[in-house]
Structure formats: C-alpha cells, structure tokens
Amino acid sequence: MNEFILAMILLCLFGFCVLYYRMNRIQPEPAEPDDDRYSIAAILLFVREAFNDILKTNLYEMNITREEFDKRVHNRNQLRKALKTCTYGDMNAKNYIRDFIKDILVKRYNINEGNIHRIISFDNPDKLTVQDKFEILLYHSKKLHGYRALEALIIENHLDRPVMVADGVSFKVTADDIERIFLQKQHLYCFEDKLNIIAQRVYQLYKGYGVIDEIRDMRIDGVSGGVSGIPSTFHEEVDLSVGISIVSSLPSSYDSIWVFFKGKTIHLSFLSFGSESELIRVCKNIYRYNYPGQLSESNGYKVNEMKDGSRVVVVRPPFAESWAFFVRKFDSIEKAEVQELIIDKGKEIPIELIKWLVKGCRVTAVTGSQGTGKTTLLMAIIKYISPAFTLRIQELAFELHLRKIYPERNILTFRETPTISGQEGLDLQKKTDGTVNILGEVATAPVSAWMLQMAQVASLFTLFTHHAKTTENLVKALRNNLLQTGAFSNEKIAEQQVADVINFDIHLTKDITGHRYIERITEILPVESVGYPNLTASGGEALNTEFLTAAREFFVRMTDRKIFETRDIVVWENGCYKGVGRLSEGQIASIEQTLTSDEREE
C-alpha cells in the first residue's frame, strides 16, 4: 500500500515538473499591440468610418459663420458626389477621393516617415509581396509614362512574348517575372511616393476595383477577371476527404486576371482578388454607370459603358459558372491613324484602296474575329469621309465615341435602350439630316435588317463591322438574319438583296503572337440576271433541244444558281500586301461619280 502511495506521489511530481517546464519554455515574442493598427484592413476600416463621420456631421450644431457653413456644405456635397461617381470610371472623382484618403492618413491616422514602413515594408524588399512590388513598379512607371505605364512596363521587359507551357504557347506574366524586374530597378522612395502607393491600395479596396483598379485606367485594349481558375461551386461539390491538398493548390476564379494588350490576351498569374467576396464586389460596382439595372439571378448579365467610354460586360451565376467581368477599352490609340494600324510591307496598297472606297461612298463591311481591331480601324477610316457629310451612328452600346476623335464634324450617335428600340432609332435618323450611316456592330438579326434598310434608303452609304470569317459567310449570315426577322421568306431573294447592298469586305485577322493585319479586301459581285433562252425552232429535234436547255436553265436558277461572286483585290501573303485583282468597271464608275474634280485627278 505504501509503495502504491509513493508511486502516485512520484507520478504527480513528474507531471508537475513537465507542466512547469512547458509553461516556462521560451515563447515567441508577442506581436506589438500597434501592429494591427498598421494593417491595411485596420486602415481601410478607419478610412471608411472617417468618411461616414464627415458626411454625417450635423453642421447646424457647429458654431461657425454663414460663409464657413456654406463652404462646408459645398465641400460635403462635392465629396458625396465624388464617392458616388468614382466607381463609374470617373478619373477626376477617383483622384479627389484618393487625395482625401491621403489627408485622412496623415492628419487623422498620424502616418509619417517613421511609421509608414510598418504598413508596406518599403525599407525591406524581402518583406514585400508580389502585389506590393507590382504596384510599386506600376507607380514609378506611371510617373514617367502616365496612362501608358503598363504598356511601357510590358514592352520594356518583353512581358508580351509567348512562353511555352504544358499545353503549348501562351502569354503569361508570373511572380518570378515581377521579382526579376523589381530586382533590376533601383527605386528611391520619398514619403510622398510611399503615401501615394498606400492611398491607392486603400482606395482600390474601398471604392475602386481591387487589384485591377490601376490596370483598368491604363491605355490597354481591355482587362477581365473571373474567367479562369476553379469556380467556387467546385469546392462545394468535391469530396475534400480525397485529395484535399490537390484541391487547395488549384487556382480559384478570384485568382483570375487577364489583360488584352495589342491583340494578345496575357494572364497576370501573380495577381489575385484574394477572395470570392472581393471579386463579387468588383463585379457589382464596375457596371453601374448611368444605372443600367440590377444584376440578379434572374438577369444574370449586364452590358454597359463606363464614364470614360469603356465597354463593360458582367456575368454571374446561374447564368455563368462564376462571377466574371470584361472591360474593353477603346483609348489605347488616342487618335487612330490608318498608317499606325496597317504596318506591314506594302501597306500603301490597302491604305490607298480603303481611302478611295470610303471617299467613293461604297457600302463596306469591316469583318474579323474578336480582338482583331475592327472597331479601331473603323474609327480610323472615318477621316476619309468628306467633312461635308453628316454622320449618324447606331450602336447597341456607345463604343466608337467618334466626336472625341473628330470634334469638328457633324456626328450624332444613337443607341438602343430598354424603352426605345433600334428600329425606332433608325426611323428617327431619317429625320436628322444624316448623310452617312455607321453601324457599330452587326451581331443580331434585327441589326442586320437595320443595316440593309440604312444602306438602301436611309443614307448615301453605310459602314459596319461584323464577325464573319469569309465574304461568303458574311453574305449568307446576313441572309439568314433577314429570313429570321421575317423581312424575307425566299432565301434567294434575301441573298440577292444582301449581295446588291454590300460592295466590299475588309477582313482583319491576327496571328498567334497578336500581330493584327488585313488578310484581304474583297469585292462582292452580284451575278447579273439573264433572260431565259427563247425557243426559236419550229419543231423537231431542234425544238426538243432548245426546250431541254431552257428547262435545265430554269431548274438551275431555282436550285443552285449563284447569286454573287467574290473577287479579292488585295491580299496579305508572307508578311506583305499584294494587289491581286482589279475593281469591277461598275464600281470604278460609281466611285468616280462621288469624287470631286481634284480627287478624280489624284
């Protein structure tokens, strides 16, 4: 019994020693209480509350003069308006709010040279994240190149070159690329630079578009998010007990950021929104300019424009498998010149031909797949239209913005709205003294019918864009659209109408490296109708032969008679433009009729 008690005492003593040792082991040094104060999340919360306090302050309770009262009311109204419009792509409002944030950080949050490095470790590059380094690089590039900062960063460091991946060639910027570029740059940070970078980080999480906020402002072709990676529903459905490490290593949809740059779609794999909720916040805010309606489960997509003229498309589940947005910008070329767009050897040939087609008032389609530069080329060739002509444009969403490029010309653009159909807009255009009609994009059956109407009765001539791959596909696609709308019931007659209206097809394409060029310029030649052969024989075998010939001609016309032919005038071969055909005599005569005497001599 005594031995048992002794053993229990020794066991308790041993346990006490072990417990005492563990409690007195050297613990890691606790974080300073102030460390949380300098986190971006804490600063964001403080800034949000500071703005709320400013807007909710009761000025009537303050003992101030009437002049000071009016001044504060004006400033508060200006702040409230800027907070609302900065999310629409309004650069002035964005800069105003960002400056306000800087003021709050310095005067209220007491950020100074001594503590600013605790927010972002400017003094210790090893502690910087890849996002920190990218934003620092972009900030310094912006100081030199303005809104062409991202363009300069990509070109100077060859980030738009194709790279080999497991499945083939792709365009991708990795974290290693950013680390390498950052090591090559020796940046000297003043306090103002550090404060600007931090203010931008806070702004983009508060009212901006997250990590793409500054990217969206750059002079690029576009930016999109949520278009790659594993959708959130996959993580809900997968059995996490099997291969949980594999699932966690896969990129999510909120890790997806792509930029469209000079015809190339480049994956910025080092950037991420950080969470599904942040991607959803950006999607919900980026399309709201001019109140286009609510994005909801029942209305799962929205197409709109932003304050700066960018086109934005937003989709959400259940219509799409994940939340995603697409911003397409049209300011990468400030004033599009044809000579800047068509750059290959022999470019004088297509440029001269396009010039005379437009001056000659030919109905012309600019075709090609997405991202080949159709809209940009259309904007550029407008300059060949006589300044004496008035232009009327019909679009689904404002994209061309021709008055920004040609402010001295008589130009007015209409678009379809929930209450005004495109057909009503077209009917109204006939009463607006328009000479030339331009359709931004012929993508649906009703728009095809508009185009045919405009080209036949509403204007001197028409220019439009289309996604057709070949000239034959262009004519047949428009024919099918006319049949779909019910404007025609006979396939041959509908095709004849299209072939009679459209004169030329300028087809654009791009190669795997993103190089854009005109693949061909093609003339559409309607096949002229010829009367049926007359029966001249009086009888016998000759009459039978003539009858069979006439019968054969009838059945050919009723079944497989060609309505039109195509003739390539200019083609692109091996990096060079070549003239391979001549315009028909009828088109040459029609062009000459619309030219001035000086232009005919030229």
Which residues are covered by each model-predicted region?
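N-terminal accessory targeting/assembly segments
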Residues: 8-295
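P-loop NTP-binding catalytic core
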Residues: 244-360
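Walker A (P-loop) ATP-phosphate-binding motif of ABC ATPase nucleotide-binding domains
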Residues: 363
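Hydrophobic anchor at the beta1->P-loop junction of P-loop NTPases
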Residues: 366
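The conserved Walker
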Residues: 369-370
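Conserved lysine of the Walker
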Residues: 374
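Switch/coupling sub-region of P-loop NTPases
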Residues: 380-499, 508-510
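NTP-binding/hydrolysis catalytic cores, primarily Walker-type P-loop NTPases
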Residues: 519-602
